[in-house]
Structure formats: C-alpha cells, structure tokens
C-alpha cells in the first residue's frame, strides 16, 4: 500500500516544483531520501535501563528497531570508555520514512506546547533539514504512564535538493509547518 505523503509528492509536488524551479528532467526534482532519528544518552553508560527504554520508545515511534551507537574514543571527563553505548539511532527510508514524516507533520508537531511553527533556519546549506524534539510525549504512540524520563531526540531529513531554497520548498509542499 503506497503511503499518502508519497502519493501527494508524486501527483502534486513534483509538477509544482518542476514549474517553480524550471527543471527540465523529472529526476532533478528534489525528494526526501532518508530520515535519521537520533537520541544521545548521557546516562546510558551507567544505566542499562535507560538504554533499553530508549530502544523501546524509538522502535515504537519509528516502527523500526534502532541501532545502539557506541563511543569511538574514551573520554575521561565524561567517564566514557571506548565501545560504551552512548545513544540509539534509526535510519528510515522508503515507505517507513514517508509514514514517519506524515505522523511527524500532522500528529506530533501540532501537539507541542505553544507551537507556532518550526524554524526555517535549520537547513545545512545543502537542502537537508535538522530538527530537535524536546520530549517524546508529542508522539501519540508513546503512553504517558510507561515512560521513566522525558528525553528528546534529533530528527534529520536528508533530501536530494542542491540548495536550502529547494529543500525548503519541498518540505513546505509536504506540509512542514515553518514559522513565518
């Protein structure tokens, strides 16, 4: 079953962006390639339960099992040895990516307290967008009673856009609520 957002992209966004940026080839139109959801855990090296709950929460939110990221180097100031778990990460592509993006735009972001839109300045110069989420409770899949601590996550949306202007136009057409 094709994702709703993917269908909208193919039917309406591609022709609109082709006209706006006067692309000659339909493959020039920017598209979302992947979404990475990352959560760094400072206390994971001492607390295995925090790591386990983060894995469960991210797999519930994204629908895919996260990978445990480990420290590359030992850092004495942070009491971290090489190979210790320091976070969890999920890379979403294809249908799961579109499903997650749809839920993020239409369900999760509007549930943020005092939400007035997201910053349009978080582009990296190559059309990719990064967004920090302060608490996992904005996702409807997370049950308030089952969480042990409020933790945030970083969401990076990687596109094939060459410039920030193209990336912004793509995400705006997908429904991303940018602050005006």
Curated annotation (Swiss-Prot):
Cellular component, GO annotation: ribonucleoprotein complex; ribosome
Manganese: is it a keyword of this entry? no
Q: Which UniProt keywords apply?
A: Ribonucleoprotein, Ribosomal protein, RNA-binding, rRNA-binding, tRNA-binding
Q: Which GO terms describe its molecular function?
A: rRNA binding; structural constituent of ribosome; tRNA binding
InterPro entries, alphabetized: Ribosomal_uL5 (IPR002132), Ribosomal_uL5_bac-type (IPR020930), Ribosomal_uL5_C (IPR031309), Ribosomal_uL5_CS (IPR020929), Ribosomal_uL5_dom_sf (IPR022803), Ribosomal_uL5_N (IPR031310)
Listed SUPFAM superfamilies = RL5-like
Tell me which positions the record assigns to the signal sequence: none
Q: GO terms for biological process?
A: translation
Keyword Transmembrane in record:
no
Give one Pfam hit by family name: Ribosomal_L5
Q: Which PROSITE patterns match?
A: RIBOSOMAL_L5
Q: According to its UniProt entry, what is the function of this protein?
A: This is one of the proteins that bind and probably mediate the attachment of the 5S RNA into the large ribosomal subunit, where it forms part of the central protuberance. In the 70S ribosome it contacts protein S13 of the 30S subunit (bridge B1b), connecting the 2 subunits; this bridge is implicated in subunit movement. Contacts the P site tRNA; the 5S rRNA and some of its associated proteins might help stabilize positioning of ribosome-bound tRNAs.
Subunit and partners = Part of the 50S ribosomal subunit; part of the 5S rRNA/L5/L18/L25 subcomplex. Contacts the 5S rRNA and the P site tRNA. Forms a bridge to the 30S subunit in the 70S ribosome.
What family is this protein classified in?
Belongs to the universal ribosomal protein uL5 family.
User: Under what name is this protein listed?
Assistant: Large ribosomal subunit protein uL5
Recorded source organism is Rippkaea orientalis (strain PCC 8801 / RF-1)
